[in-house]
Design a protein with these regions (language model features):
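Sec-dependent signal peptide recognition
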Residues: 2-9
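C-terminal motif of bacterial Sec signal peptides marking the signal peptidase cleavage site
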Residues: 14-17
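Entry beta-strands of beta-propeller and related beta-repeat scaffolds
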Residues: 141-147, 202-205, 260, 370-373, ...
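Short glycine/acidic-enriched loop and turn motifs that connect beta-strands
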Residues: 151-155, 212-214, 267-268, 322-323, ...
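Preference for solvent-exposed, low-hydrophobicity sequence contexts
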Residues: 169, 176-189, 195-415, 419, ...
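Repeat-based blade/solenoid architectures
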Residues: 183-188, 345-358, 405-412, 450-471, ...
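Intrinsically disordered, low-complexity segments enriched in Gly and acidic/Ser/Thr residues
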Residues: 380-499
Length: 536
């Protein structure tokens, strides 16, 4: 009983103490904070644009919180969306050391997608409210059209870009390789591009010229002599020859191709069979037995099915010395994939693969599920067109066009074949023509209006090259349609500097045999090749 009295006494003392201490606490209500006016995604050009955020912060007790309110502190941080560290082993970077409400800071980050974090702290209660948003940082070389040019009379190799920063923002950038270690080379020939989902090599980008071919870092475009294709992809570097044409053979594998193939300016062909451990280019394959010396020269073209996902396992070359088509095919025996073989004629076929003519041009398309077009010329200067279907086992003679009603076709050296319609485009001087192969009718493309001092330097359709087009980061109908637009590269020979090049994009009307200009960019050198740098 005595213990109960003691407990009751202590409880009373404590209760009195609480009443006495009543004025020592702040019973202010907690404020609810809402954050508005922050976009879901901010897209910027790295080391050029600023990351700008102007949020609206509202307190349920104080109303809208303004810049300089001493009761609140603001924090902005950034981290990689894919994870990993930013700098000095830290996961986050503080974008706003001054703790101000509004953010305006240079986007000094590598091209990638990041998560931005904005936090509001009520310093009176210590309660913090936050929200996140994406920050997509692009570089001039991150995504867009790689425009390979020859600059000036010396034809210095120069890479320009049409950078796709966003759907609404497309910006030309010029001579992007000059500060990135690219050597001084002359006579550009083309761009080799092999996107794939393998960790090694990942996306492959080659700039090809008559003085050397160099691989570019897939993110930064940096390069040096160690990235010379002879040092990267060849077991034994070839002698005095340079890779000038590069292509891949794709089947239905969504991760990688079956093989990479190339041709040098010496007329030698090489095969890199990707299923082989330590795959690399070996000895020339334009020979009768693996490892032996070449016995003929091949033209600088490689015909494959461009269907995606891939549907073939073969490629077609052209033997310039013996005027015949030669075949490469994926197989189960390594040595058979290191030799080209004559393509056998089938009884009753539309044409023979031993043509007795010179090859003028060859192009790979998606038309008819993988048709390769070849323009051939006989000794009398007359031209015809063969269509070889390369789907499946390939080498199917599918079409042949003779006696073309095509003005100046015999003078043309620049061509492009459409992948949706039976159309051939060709250029002579500053004129572009559309030839309908189905009706043997030619239409001058008057909507492609070039001046008297302008000449066409390139015609092309940029077919996307991902192993699976479903991997592309942009699945919009508009973006997919871009690959069927005619690209027209032209040059003004009267330009006061070396920047007289233009690149126009023309959607093709398959009903009215016509084209219309969608966009045009200028300031380039003499355009040789254009390839879209795709992203997954």
């Amino acid at each position: 009983m005595k213990m109960n009295y003691i407990i009751l006494f202590l409880f009373g003392v404590s209760l009195c103490a609480c009443f006495d201490d009543k004025g020592n606490y702040d019973y202010r209500d907690m404020a609810d904070i809402t954050i508005e006016n922050i976009p879901e995604v901010i897209e910027v050009l790295g080391n050029s644009d600023h990351i700008v955020v102007s949020p609206k912060v509202v307190s349920s007790l104080d109303g809208e919180v303004k810049e300089g309110d001493a009761n609140f502190e603001f924090t902005y941080k950034i981290e990689k969306k894919s994870g990993g560290t930013m700098v000095a082993g830290q996961k986050w970077v503080d974008l706003n050391p001054s703790k101000t409400l509004n953010l305006d800071t240079l986007a000094a980050f590598a091209a990638d997608t990041y998560i931005g974090w904005f936090g509001v702290t009520d310093k009176r209660s210590g309660v913090q409210t936050s929200t996140t948003f994406d920050i997509k940082v692009s570089s001039p070389t991150y995504e867009g059209w790689m425009v390979l040019c020859n600059e000036g009379e010396q034809e210095r190799v120069r890479m320009d870009m049409i950078s796709a920063i966003s759907a609404e923002r497309v910006i030309p950038a010029y001579d992007v390789l000059a500060p990135l270690g690219f050597p001084e080379l002359r006579h550009a020939r083309g761009i080799g591009f092999y996107p794939n989902r393998r960790a090694n090599p990942d996306d492959v980008i080659y700039v090809m010229s008559e003085e050397g071919t160099y691989r570019l870092d897939r993110e930064t475009f940096k390069t040096d002599e160690s990235w010379n294709i002879n040092n990267v992809d060849f077991i034994i570097p070839p002698g005095d020859e340079h890779v000038v044409y590069y292509n891949t053979v794709n089947n239905n594998n969504s991760s990688e191709a079956l093989a990479c193939l190339c041709v040098t300016d010496a007329g030698n062909a090489y095969a890199q069979v990707l299923s082989t451990p330590g795959a690399a280019f070996e000895k020339p394959i334009n020979t009768s037995a693996r490892g032996e010396a070449p016995t003929y020269r091949v033209a600088p073209y490689i015909g494959v099915s461009m269907a995606r996902p891939g549907n073939g396992k073969a490629a077609v070359f052209y033997d310039m010395d013996n005027q015949r088509f030669m075949g490469w095919k994926q197989g189960y025996v390594d040595f058979l994939m290191q030799v080209l073989n004559p393509i056998r004629d089938k009884e009753g076929a539309l044409f023979t693969f031993k043509t007795g003519m010179d090859l003028v041009y060859m192009e790979s398309t998606r038309y008819s599920n993988g048709l390769v077009y070849a323009i051939l010329q006989d000794a009398g200067g007359k031209r015809c067109i063969y269509g070889i279907n390369m789907s499946g086992n390939g080498y199917l003679p599918e079409s042949m066009y003779k006696d073309l009603n095509a003005p100046d076709f015999d003078k043309a050296s620049i061509f492009a074949f459409h992948s949706q319609f039976p159309y051939m485009f060709y250029a002579v001087g500053n004129k572009v023509y559309l030839h309908n192969l189905g009706t043997n009718t030619t239409y001058p493309m008057n909507s492609i209006a070039l001046g008297e001092h302008e000449v066409v330097t390139m015609l092309k359709f940029n077919l996307y090259r991902q192993c699976s087009l479903k991997d592309l980061n942009n699945q919009s109908d508009e973006f997919m349609a871009r690959q069927y637009e005619l690209m027209v590269g032209s040059y003004n020979t009267d330009a006061p500097d070396n920047n007289g090049g233009k690149l126009g994009f023309y959607p093709v009307d398959g009903v009215n045999n016509s084209v219309t200009k969608r966009a045009e960019y200028d300031g380039f050198a003499r355009i040789k090749d254009v390839v879209y740098r795709e992203r997954r």
